[in-house]
Amino acid sequence: MEPVMSLALAAHGPPSILEPLFKTVTTSTTTTTTTTTSTTTTTASPAGYSPGYPGTTLLTALFENLTSTAASGLYDPYSGMYGNQTNGTIGFETKGPRYSLASMVVMGFVAAILSTVTVAGNVMVMISFKIDKQLQTISNYFLFSLAIADFAIGAISMPLFAVTTILGYWPLGPIVCDTWLALDYLASNASVLNLLIISFDRYFSVTRPLTYRAKRTTNRAAVMIGAAWGISLLLWPPWIYSWPYIEGKRTVPKDECYIQFIETNQYITFGTALAAFYFPVTIMCFLYWRIWRETKKRQKDLPNLQAGKKDSSKRSNSSDENTVVNHASGGLLAFAQVGGNDHDTWRRPRSESSPDAESVYMTNMVIDSGYHGMHSRKSSIKSTNTIKKSYTCFGSIKEWCIAWWHSGREDSDDFAYEQEEPSDLGYATPVTIETPLQSSVSRCTSMNVMRDNYSMGGSVSGVRPPSILLSDVSPTPLPRPPLASISQLQEMSAVTASTTANVNTSGNGNGAINNNNNASHNGNGAVNGNGAGNGSGIGLGTTGNATHRDSRTLPVINRINSRSVSQDSVYTILIRLPSDGASSNAANGGGGGPGAGAAASASLSMQGDCAPSIKMIHEDGPTTTAAAAPLASAAATRRPLPSRDSEFSLPLGRRMSHAQHDARLLNAKVIPKQLGKAGGGAAGGGVGGAHALMNARNAAKKKKKSQEKRQESKAAKTLSAILLSFIITWTPYNILVLIKPLTTCSDCIPTELWDFFYALCYINSTINPMCYALCNATFRRTYVRILTCKWHTRNREGMVRGVYN
């Protein structure tokens, strides 16, 4: 049995154990006397066994084969030896804990807190991205990728680093060491590249908002994120695993864990440090500097880009004549025109919303000064079979901008409906070039007045009574008419009122409004399917049994005139509606002969002469003047518009669902409430109202500038904090990486300093969720939902406010 035991020991132990048994085998192995003595106590040769034993030759050959095989075995780079040879310089017994027990407890507690905060913060970022649809944007895709990298650092890298730092040595062996280093450097480098991608994304979004955002798709974002992880995967893990085989041996001791080529090859060290840190941080600094410079430039140029400057190439609501309609004491049409460069300073972009700048809404009146109206907006874009006229470059650009602006609006379905209608169905409500309605403003039909040489007869002084426009489709471009001045507008209003009175009081049944059951309606009055008269001071009325004469029965020249509407001659007015008594008389005039309807219309016309025909509607409630009382009453009692299927349906092509719920009319113009109130005071109070207007304007301008400065300052501070935190946490370690290969002294840099700077890089993963996510209000609200376990609830109020404001 003893030879068998010796053979087993020889297979698993050092070859020196066999020396007491067979002195002839000890040719290549030497041991000390102490070792042989302790070994021979358990392996003593029995009696009768001697070096001349017959079995000695066989055993000698066997053991020589075993020892030669072990000596010529494959090289193991992780053990640093061939076969079962041992290296006395590498072992776990050489090092122990470097810190006291109290220090180890404190370090473990701090490391556990940092790791938990890092993991929790990045998990909240990923959950927020998942449960809130508002956060699923292109920019937040980059944040999601960054959160994945930081989560890996907090879950894997930080705990293992804390273990090796507290114990003072690496206890898990070389294979786990290389795996930990590969994952650690992969996640850290991916985190840096994700920061770089975010920097590029913000830079292009600021400097190239139009071209870049068109290419900024989810697929491109996925490609960029994949590139960040792919570069990190190629840069670190392959070299960490393969470097001991490249050099032929592993120089890292078993009780330590670091990348071998950082100490053995200074060229690789410099290259990886430049590629992993110095190049990205340099690019990030440059990009953020450009972003900061562009922000400052825009902040400096902001007064020139505001709506106060007249720039028709960028604004669709600019017109050739900017007038503000106010209430005058006894005038038919009173316009308070603000002169100088301050007349547009109250205008605000559509994207801005402020509680200090509320709005009032006013309808639009279109005036054709005796010429063929200019072609409409859609015909200038879609009509290809018509004769082209020569237009100015400014006019063409203006037309294109208007069509482009309306192409993405919510009422684009109205345009499709208008295309279905024939172009010769008459008039439709024209779309003006004023500021489009916000999405929260309901569309209602408006009354639009047009003056031209319409009919061959039945007019006074060559001017026909104003009509309701039923179509703005004009397939034939016509010359641009001259603009109607304010004096012409006032003269037109006076002539219109007198014409309406004369025509309607004739009593012969041939006027614009006729109560005869056999009379036909020529389009000069408003036809209500319910038989109620909704007239105004400009001669609007109805008959109970009147029939609508389609414009196709008119002469061709008149239809051509009727289809064209001038978009430049646009003035904002409100058509006065009749009182309840007048409406009742007009509705009941069918049985009283021609004189009854004429008298009712005449009374409406006279009422329009006595009261102001232009009135500003304030959003905070009805006006308190006595003249405006009938207007408010009529607007409150106005009946719903006829449907498309009724006998007197009008091809307005507008959504009628909001007409009976909102008294604000179609194509309303949005102006600040301060200007409306101050403008009314200026018309009635003279210099005092003008001073009030200027004070309100200056106060709003100062407050807006202060808000913009605060926003720009906050954005600049956020960008600076992000860049500063990255530089502070990553620079010290990367400086040591470049310094250590250059120094011949291995102990010049203390181990504690290495560990501290290495841990500082991890802290950047803890700061990233705070810098990127907590600066976003939507992230903060989602964090609160997660912490309060409200996973499936939504902030409806915030969503509605974000969509409709």
Curated annotation (Swiss-Prot):
GO terms for biological process: adenylate cyclase-inhibiting G protein-coupled acetylcholine receptor signaling pathway; chemical synaptic transmission; G protein-coupled acetylcholine receptor signaling pathway; G protein-coupled receptor signaling pathway, coupled to cyclic nucleotide second messenger; phospholipase C-activating G protein-coupled receptor signaling pathway. Residues 27-43, 507-525 have a biased composition (Low complexity). Keywords: Cell membrane, G-protein coupled receptor, Glycoprotein, Membrane, Phosphoprotein, Postsynaptic cell membrane, Receptor, Synapse, Transducer, Transmembrane, Transmembrane helix. Glycans are attached at residues 65, 84, 87. It holds the Pfam family 7tm_1. Residues 122-141, 199-220, 288-718, 774-805 are cytoplasmic. It is found in: Cell membrane; Postsynaptic cell membrane. Residues 27-47, 302-322, 340-359, 507-530 are annotated as: Disordered. InterPro entries: GPCR_Rhodpsn, GPCR_Rhodpsn_7TM, Musac_Ach_rcpt. Belongs to the G-protein coupled receptor 1 family. Muscarinic acetylcholine receptor subfamily. The muscarinic acetylcholine receptor mediates various cellular responses, including inhibition of adenylate cyclase, breakdown of phosphoinositides and modulation of potassium channels through the action of G proteins. Primary transducing effect is Pi turnover. May have a role in the processing of olfactory and mechanosensory signals; regulation of neurosecretion. This is Muscarinic acetylcholine receptor DM1. It comes from Drosophila melanogaster. The lineage of its organism: Eukaryota, Metazoa, Ecdysozoa, Arthropoda, Hexapoda. The gene is mAChR-A.
